[in-house]
């Protein structure tokens, strides 16, 4: 019992710190958008994309690359820690409780992708972007949920977090399987050896953090050169960090996650937003609106239909039950908030169209538009959820 209480206490502290980073991220996204449409736009672009005078890693020769391939690996490391914690000691550890959020997350990824592919059906060059509207931004969504105020069932926030974590796991799998090219076997072999060494360290019962952190950096370096996106290394390394509590109720994973929550939420993700969210609203993106429209509709409509539809079907079939105290309107609002793609969607957009900056800019427009409308709609629906609903 003491072990379970220890997990719950640290889990509670982590949960309490999730709203503020979302609000900071919203502010950074707004600032990036403002600068991109101001006389400072050219200087801002040069700041992130001009070659650095010196870099310790030749492949990362701009600030933008260091943020997207370097700092974002730390972001994915934290995502990996969250996933492992939830699977072993959280909501996803109970088969009955994980049914609904897992089903909702899978449907919430599949339906947006199908809507995107339907809208871009006549343009095969755009099909690589199918995963862009499938993502959910945990920090952004929790930040908006915090603006609703009190009066919502506690189970709703937990449901949103669990769906978003499963969604993150799906995004990691998608990145590893569909956005990998030019594999280099020697670097892959080196990555496999480092990962095996980390697993061995775990099996030996080592609880000091230094071996895991050193191994994570080495794994990131080899994966960066292997052809697989470097951020995947963050998730793989996180999976080797031990979760189990010792007699003093100390868990290396929880200790590490707790230490990284603030840097991740207040430094890494906001920097990513500043470097990637800016888009010139008056720019000429070409004749076809299919790319931004497909992304926006995938986020706004796909998430609603996928998540809310899967919940209703699961209830009707007796497969799962809605969160305690949640009404249909509550769940509709949560489905809308899951349409806030932002961080992960922007990240996938860069992977989908690495050689075509114009398509990335178009994708940004769809991501920002779809995420903004989803956020506002979700806020309105949840703020009015005090009225009698089914």
Curated annotation (Swiss-Prot):
Entry annotated with the keyword Cell membrane: yes
InterPro entries found in the cross-reference section: Na/H_antiporter_dom_sf (IPR023171), NhaA (IPR004670)
Membrane topology value: Multi-pass membrane protein
Cellular location(s): Cell inner membrane
Catalytic activity of the protein: Na(+)(in) + 2 H(+)(out) = Na(+)(out) + 2 H(+)(in)
Transport in keyword set: yes
Coiled-coil stretches: none
GO cellular component entries: plasma membrane
Molecular functions per Gene Ontology: sodium:proton antiporter activity
GO terms, biological process: regulation of pH
TM helices/strands, residue ranges: 23-43, 63-83, 100-120, 129-149, 158-178, 181-201, 208-228, 265-285, 293-313, 331-351, 362-382
Function: Na(+)/H(+) antiporter that extrudes sodium in exchange for external protons.
Family: Belongs to the NhaA Na(+)/H(+) (TC 2.A.33) antiporter family.
Protein's recorded name: Na(+)/H(+) antiporter NhaA 2
